[in-house]
Amino acid sequence: RNELMPFIDEIKEGDSVCLSIRMGDYIKNPIHGVCSQKYYQAAIDKMYELHPNAKIFVFSDDVEAVKKTYSFKNNVFYEPDGCNELEKITYMSMCKHFILSNSSFSWWTQYLCSYKKKTVIAPEKWYAVDIPCDIYEDNWILLSV
C-alpha cells in the first residue's frame, strides 16, 4: 500500500520504538490480565531516558484510549487505519526498540526484529496468575506491572 510508505520511512529512520498496548479481550481475562497504566508510562519514560530522540509508534486495539491516557514527549505515531494483522506485525517488527505488552503477538514483534542493539522493555510478570514463564531475554529491562 503506497499510502503507507511515509509511515514505513518514519519507522526506518532514527530510534523507532514499537509500543504495543493490548486492551480488548485481555481486560477481563483472569490469566493474562492487563499491564497497568503505570507500567506503560514508566516504560515510555524509561525508553525516552535511554533514547532521547525516540519516535514512539503506537499499536493498540484501542488507539483512541491510548491518545487520551498516555503522555509522550515528542515524535509519536499511531498505527495506520485498516491494517490487517500481517501488516501490523510487519510494521511493528521494523522498529528498533520495543515496549511490550504481555501478549504473544507483542513478543513476536521483537523476536522478528533484525536490529541487533534493540532495547526491549517488558512487564516483569507476564501472567496475572503464577504460571512459569521463560520468554525473557537476559538483556531485557523488566518493569513491574
Predicted regions located by residue number:
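A donor-sugar binding/catalytic signature common to diverse glycosyltransferases
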Residues: 85-132
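Core catalytic architecture of nucleotide-activated donor-dependent transferases building glycoconjugates
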Residues: 1-85
